[in-house]
């Protein structure tokens, strides 16, 4: 039945002269026999539909083919298959990849998965030689390889997107390093800062996000291929040869672990969740700042929407969607944790659920970054409104207390005296800047005329010289550190 003159082989020879889409049905029927030998009944349609994963794992076609090319090269080099057959397989796979990418070959949605489709196409083109590709390999270690290769590429893409956002933040921070606005705690005006300082807070968060992504990739960059289904293989394979071809730093130390864990997916989803936390917080502030209650910024028309009934509306929909989509990524992380928490070693079909979750997390983060970065880049900063807001709310009260500390008064006493002054101002409708000096001196005789310079907003910001603070010079240093970090970043 399995000889060179079998019905299957006759069909394959015939199919070589036909367009790819014509041979799909028969070819996938052939590949369905990969695991059918033990079974006496045909697969129910419901089972086939429920079991299939090609509709979401087909995005890994390039990684699947590239991994198979490396595997075939190794099989030939190690004498496990004839070198001439290895070369034919590699050439055939290369042609399949080119045909898919040119649009000449469509991935069959009726295939069980991308691995089955690729091997089926190869066998249709090469006959018996194509069937040798899967020697010393299981779909268990094959899919573990494909996911790692795919996610390494996606990490690089997301890191590049974050770097683009960081470049925009550094540019905006440089432009606004002297623009004063209120800093908030509990959403109450607290102390004066600069808009550049505020932007660099998010830059610091995103730098840590980049660090985490690099760290995830480092642990992910271990080759699982060669683990077999779970117990390795009896063939004299060279795993490190494959690792070198595919740019992996090492090979998995344990074959059970190599095929049965998806902690690298969970780690990536966790890192991406933190990216979304930071984007969501930033989005929340953008949404507030755009409102008439703040009016600190205005988004470009190209990154805003209107209302179907209220003609005056200009809505920050991108920021709102980023804030909302954070929940999707958190949900993807929860999905992965739930899938993996209760399955015994080694591979279980539950693990097929890993791909939709991690791919959704990846795609969502990329989509958000692609919209968020140009929104920030084109955003107009309403500097006068920021300054006007900083003039209210007694945000220079701490500086007033520090003035008394500089005169020798203990901080707690200085704090109490300043609190009394603020209470007076509230009762009389004044600010600390407009409160007469005699009222200052009635509370504490250490006050003198120079207190007005001390509590001037520009002075308040300029004298906050501690490392990481809001003064323009400090913001300059923060920008320089981020730029140096980006220059050295490994991805």
Show the residue positions of the predicted features.
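Short, Lys/Arg-enriched N-terminal segments with co-localized hydrophobic residues
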Residues: 10-30
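Charged, flexible cofactor/metal-binding loops and thiol motifs
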Residues: 147, 174, 182, 188-342, ...
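Short linear loop/turn motifs
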Residues: 88-91, 256-261, 417-421, 456-459
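A helix-coil-helix interface module used to build multimeric assemblies
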Residues: 32-232, 237-244, 250, 305-306, ...
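Glycine-rich cofactor/substrate-binding loops
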Residues: 32-67, 128-129, 310-491
């Amino acid at each position: 039945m399995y000889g060179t003159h079998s019905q299957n082989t006759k069909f394959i020879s015939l199919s070589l002269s036909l367009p790819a889409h014509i041979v799909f049905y028969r070819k996938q029927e052939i590949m369905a026999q990969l695991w059918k030998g033990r079974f006496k009944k045909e697969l129910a349609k419901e089972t086939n539909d429920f079991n299939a994963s090609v509709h979401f794992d087909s995005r890994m076609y390039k990684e699947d083919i590239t991994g198979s090319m490396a595997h075939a090269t190794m099989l030939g080099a190690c004498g496990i298959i004839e070198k001439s057959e290895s070369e034919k397989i590699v050439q055939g796979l290369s042609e399949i990849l080119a045909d898919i990418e040119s649009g000449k070959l469509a991935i069959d949605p009726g295939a069980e998965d991308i691995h089955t489709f690729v091997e089926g196409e190869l066998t249709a083109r090469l006959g018996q030689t194509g069937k040798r590709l899967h020697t010393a390999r299981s779909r268990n270690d094959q899919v573990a390889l494909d996911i790692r290769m795919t996610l390494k590429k996606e990490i690089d893409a997301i890191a590049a997107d974050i770097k683009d956002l960081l470049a925009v933040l550094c540019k905006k921070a440089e432009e606004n390093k002297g623009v004063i606005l209120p800093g908030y705690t509990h959403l109450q005006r607290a102390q004066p800062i600069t808009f550049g300082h505020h932007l660099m807070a998010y830059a610091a968060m995103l730098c840590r996000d980049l660090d985490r992504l690099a760290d995830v990739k480092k642990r992910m960059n271990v080759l699982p291929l060669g683990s077999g289904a779970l117990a390795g293989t009896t063939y004299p394979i060279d795993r490190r040869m494959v690792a070198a071809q595919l740019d992996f730093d090492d090979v998995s130390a344990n074959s059970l672990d190599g095929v049965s864990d998806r902690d690298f997916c969970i780690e990536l989803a966790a890192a991406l969740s933190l990216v979304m936390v930071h984007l969501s917080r930033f989005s929340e502030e953008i949404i507030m700042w755009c409102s008439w209650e703040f009016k600190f910024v205005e988004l470009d028309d190209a990154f805003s929407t209107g209302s179907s009934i209220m003609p005056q509306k200009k809505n920050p929909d991108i920021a709102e969607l980023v804030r909302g989509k954070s929940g999707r990524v958190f949900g993807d992380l929860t999905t992965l944790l739930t899938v993996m928490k209760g399955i015994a070693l080694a591979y279980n079909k539950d693990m097929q659920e890993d791909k939709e979750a991690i791919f959704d997390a990846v795609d969502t983060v990329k989509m958000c970054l692609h919209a968020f970065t140009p929104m920030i880049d084109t955003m107009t900063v309403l500097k006068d409104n920021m300054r006007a807001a900083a003039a209210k709310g007694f945000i220079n009260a701490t500086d007033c207390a520090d003035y008394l500390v500089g005169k020798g008064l203990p901080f707690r006493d200085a704090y109490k005296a300043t609190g009394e002054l603020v209470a007076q101002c509230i009762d009389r409708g004044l600010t600390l800047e407009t409160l007469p000096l005699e009222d200052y001196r009635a509370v504490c005789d250490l006050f003198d005329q120079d207190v007005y310079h001390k509590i001037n907003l520009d002075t308040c910001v300029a004298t906050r010289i501690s490392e990481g603070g809001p003064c323009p010079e400090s913001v300059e240093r923060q920008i320089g550190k981020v730029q140096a970090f980006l220059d050295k970043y490994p991805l």
